[in-house]
Amino acid sequence: MPEELTPTPETAVVEAGPVSRWLSENGFENTALERDHLGVEIVQVDREVLLPIAAALFAYGFNYLQCQGGYDLGPGQDLVSFYHLTKVSDDASQPQEVRVKVFLPRHDPKVPSVFWIWKGADWQERETFDMYGIQFEGHPNLKRILMPEDWVGWPLRKDYISPDFYELQDAY
């Protein structure tokens, strides 16, 4: 009797949602990922096509960047920059939402800034840079926002080693 293969989350086929289908129909490469626990559609895109896809989604009505953030998949694995977008309209009782994810190699965590599409990305991209070291190319003021400017490393990376001592400088 042949052995049956049980799909894992990495190999399971995910049905493309309406946003993923719209992107594909309009020539934008993307991969549909499993929806989150609230049913929000998630699409994965390559960093090289993030800006054209972001501009297309803005034109499609996703005019509000609800959240931009990052996370670390683990030591030696990718970093992820994500964008939670919402269609804000007159009928906002059930706004459409989508989350866009860009997986970045740990040794080269660079992605274009979406600041020029959604101004709200300003501080959010700075925080993601400060905590994970993801470089947002084209950001007008990419510098640390939470940690001291001379801080070494990226505190929320899973391979980060905390310094034994850090001396705060007096403000005067």
UniProtKB/Swiss-Prot annotation:
Pfam family, one: Complex1_30kDa
GO biological process: photosynthesis, light reaction
EC number in record: 7.1.1.-
PROSITE patterns: COMPLEX1_30K (PS00542)
Enzyme kind, highest EC tier: translocase
Reaction(s) the record says it catalyses: a plastoquinone + NADH + (n+1) H(+)(in) = a plastoquinol + NAD(+) + n H(+)(out); a plastoquinone + NADPH + (n+1) H(+)(in) = a plastoquinol + NADP(+) + n H(+)(out)
InterPro entries cross-referenced by the UniProt entry: NADH_DH_suC, NADH_quin_OxRdtase_su_C/D-like, NADH_UbQ_OxRdtase_30kDa_su, NADH_UbQ_OxRdtase_CS
UniProt-annotated location(s): Cellular thylakoid membrane
Main location as per UniProt: membrane
A GO CC term attached to the entry: plasma membrane-derived thylakoid membrane
GO terms for MF: NADH dehydrogenase (ubiquinone) activity; quinone binding
Membrane topology, as annotated: Peripheral membrane protein
Protein keywords: Membrane, NAD, NADP, Plastoquinone, Quinone, Thylakoid, Translocase, Transport
NCBIfam families per UniProt: PRK12494.1
Subunit structure, as described in the record: NDH-1 can be composed of about 15 different subunits; different subcomplexes with different compositions have been identified which probably have different functions.
Function: NDH-1 shuttles electrons from an unknown electron donor, via FMN and iron-sulfur (Fe-S) centers, to quinones in the respiratory and/or the photosynthetic chain. The immediate electron acceptor for the enzyme in this species is believed to be plastoquinone. Couples the redox reaction to proton translocation, and thus conserves the redox energy in a proton gradient. Cyanobacterial NDH-1 also plays a role in inorganic carbon-concentration.
Protein family: Belongs to the complex I 30 kDa subunit family.
Annotated protein name in UniProt: NAD(P)H-quinone oxidoreductase subunit J
